[in-house]
Swiss-Prot record:
Role this protein plays: Signaling adapter that couples activated growth factor receptors to signaling pathway in neurons. Involved in the signal transduction pathways of neurotrophin-activated Trk receptors in cortical neurons.
UniProt xrefs under PANTHER family: SHC TRANSFORMING PROTEIN (PTHR10337), SHC-TRANSFORMING PROTEIN 3 (PTHR10337:SF4)
Residue ranges of every copy of the SH2 domain listed in the record: 379-470
Tissue: Predominantly expressed in the adult brain.
Protein species of origin: Mus musculus
Entries under Pfam families matching the protein: PID, SH2
Protein name (record): SHC-transforming protein 3
Modified residues (Phosphoserine): S282
Region (CH1) location: 215-378
PROSITE patterns linked: PID, SH2
Subunit structure: Interacts with the Trk receptors in a phosphotyrosine-dependent manner. Once activated, binds to GRB2. Interacts with activated EGF receptors.
UniProt GO cellular component terms: synapse
Domain PID: start-end pairs: 29-214
Modification comment: Tyrosine phosphorylated.
Length: 474
């Protein structure tokens, strides 16, 4: 199949830039750059990519490529003999959707979305907003003509979508996706109003696929900043001072911090881009050496992770303690507010700490004091499933706290608002108890604060008021 590139506004073919070079910013910021590729289908991803280390994410996308290629007749990536996937990968990947498999499509990449549609009828196959895309990668040495990206949509929930990009086009496609991530972040720094607000971004997390039973980490919990201690600004640390009275605290009620899910940490799309190697290579979205071309081993493919910048002041500590300190996964969300405070509007970060050896962070086990304090509270039910908790709610304002059966070491606030049950995770993986505006010294502190002040807990554009505790049975 001929792999060509054309503008979305018209059918005039655009001259292809040197291999690996970016497109003009106006193209990606505006109508987007369109490639004619082949869509092979998608395969369900049953776990959040945030919960996986970088190596596992890459294995997931490459296993997805292999599986879909084997299922689609005539796909070049199908291997006659290959090792069976590990049990871990088998547990992450689910069912395949081959409805449009083998169809020639127009893939339009812009800072707004990845749009897949048929070139003739203009039927939209999928339209994935950038905020819903978490990971993108090329294939392994045997599947270099393939690109895979993980995104959420109402039809396939979280799925890995596979594209066949012949004639060496795969690197251009993956490079354009990375460029879109980069420009989207720069766009925010120059004009925050152009990037969707929190409520708009969180709409993708309010869909049915984020139910706690099968997908706890991606539920719209109000403390959705995994693997991080609370950022330096944007909320009040309630542990450092006396508990405020309700009028004083009212200024924080309903205040939402805006989060952005991604940018490339290195200045990959700056001046060094023109000197980037033209062969198929591996580009870790997390890091690019300062002032140097990122030369990479042959046989690996570009990989992009929709992640967030680290403040410049972090780099000295990160680079000086790489041998003595374990490296954490930077695949998290951090407030734009802090990014603006810590990052100038000039050149983007050109230096990044390597995170090649990252590993998933598991929640800290609750300490004995916390458990003792919780057991003394009438609204604490102990270990309880989501379904059992919902059965105890009768009217708006009813609430309880339970130990999660699906997220080990996690505690969940379950309450009813407008006749609908809400489930909010109370402790993040670092053991911090917090809302988007405040951090508390215990779960009891958080619950009693909102109960006594009558302040609602704001999450994903909705509110949860704590009024009637559901007491546990003796």
């Amino acid at each position: 199949m001929s792999a060509t590139r054309k503008s979305r506004a018209g059918d005039e073919p655009l001259p292809r830039p040197p291999r690996g070079a970016p497109h003009t910013s106006d193209q990606v910021l505006g109508p987007g750059v369109t490639y004619v590729v082949k869509y092979l289908g998608c395969i369900e991803v049953l776990r959040s990519m945030r919960s996986l280390d970088f190596s596992t994410r890459t294995q997931v996308t490459r296993e997805a490529i292999s599986r879909v290629c084997e299922a689609v007749p005539g796909a070049k990536g199908a291997l006659k003999k290959r090792k069976p996937p590990s049990k871990m990968l088998s547990s992450i990947l689910g069912k395949s959707n081959l409805q449009f498999a083998g169809m020639s499509i127009s893939l339009t990449i812009s800072t707004a979305s990845l749009n897949l549609r048929t070139p003739d009828s203009k039927q939209i196959i999928a339209n994935h907003h950038m905020r819903s895309i978490s990971f993108a990668s090329g294939g392994d040495p045997d599947t270099t003509d393939y690109v895979a990206y993980v995104a959420k949509d109402p039809v396939n929930r979280r799925a890995c979508h596979i594209l066949e990009c012949c004639d060496g086009l795969a690197q251009d496609v993956i490079g354009s996706i990375g460029q879109a991530f980069e420009l989207r972040f720069k766009q925010y720094l120059q004009c925050p109003s152009k990037v969707p607000a929190l409520q708009d971004r969180m709409q993708s997390l309010d869909e049915p696929w984020t139910e706690e039973e099968g997908d706890g980490p991606d539920h719209p919990y109000y403390n959705s900043v995994p693997t991080k201690m609370p950022p330096p600004g944007g909320f009040l640390d309630a542990r450092l001072k006396g508990r405020p009275h309700a009028p004083e605290a009212a200024q924080f009620a309903g205040k939402e911090q805006t989060y952005y899910q991604g940018r490339h940490l290195g200045d990959t799309f700056g001046e060094d881009w023109q000197r980037a190697p033209t062969r198929q290579g591996s580009l870790d979205i997390y890091s690019t050496a300062e002032g140097k071309t990122h030369m990479v081993p042959v046989g690996e493919t570009p990989t992009y992770v929709n992640t967030q910048p680290v403040p410049p002041q972090v780099w000295p500590a990160a680079t000086s303690s790489t041998e003595s300190s374990p490296r954490k996964d930077l695949f998290d969300m951090k407030p734009f507010e802090d990014a603006l405070r810590n990052q100038p509007l000039g050149p983007m970060l050109s230096k990044a700490a390597s995170v090649e050896c990252i590993s998933p962070v598991t929640p800290r086990a609750p300490d004995a004091r916390m458990l003792e304090e919780l057991n003394a509270e009438p609204w604490y039910q102990g270990e309880m499933s989501r379904k059992e908790a919902e059965a105890l709610l009768r009217e708006d304002g009813d609430f309880l706290v339970r130990k999660s059966t699906t997220n080990p070491g996690s505690f969940v606030l379950t309450g009813m608002h407008n006749g609908q049950a809400k489930h909010l995770l109370l402790v993040d993986p670092e053991g911090t108890i917090r809302t988007k505006d405040r951090v508390f010294d215990s779960i009891s502190h958080l619950i009693n604060y909102h109960l006594e002040s009558s302040l609602p807990i704001v999450s994903a554009g909705s509110e949860l008021c704590l009024q009637q505790p559901v007491e546990r049975k003796p």
